[in-house]
Amino acid sequence: MTSSGSLVAGAVLPENYARHANYHVKTIQAYEPHGLHVNYVSLNNEPTCCPSINYPSILLITSSQMATMLKDDWFPAFKANHLTTKILLLDFNWGNADLVEPL
């Protein structure tokens, strides 16, 4: 699913954007029967944390890739499944503004 072929590092490949969105849909739905509502999810998982200890992470993709992923895959998947969960962007490593490509 990622460019590294691993849970560690690597970015989600464009051909897997829909699969990635559906993974999050299914995860969110799995919590609901237990009375747990997921309010927020994030596109990235600590992309600059701990590569030396094989910490699962998803690397940054460009802002334009994020926009495409959201527009074409995440928003439609959430809407089709009537999810009200919000999607966070760039919610990690706030001190590293250089990691962000302006839209």
Where are the regions that the model predicts?
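Substrate-binding cleft and catalytic face of glycoside hydrolase catalytic domains
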Residues: M1-P102
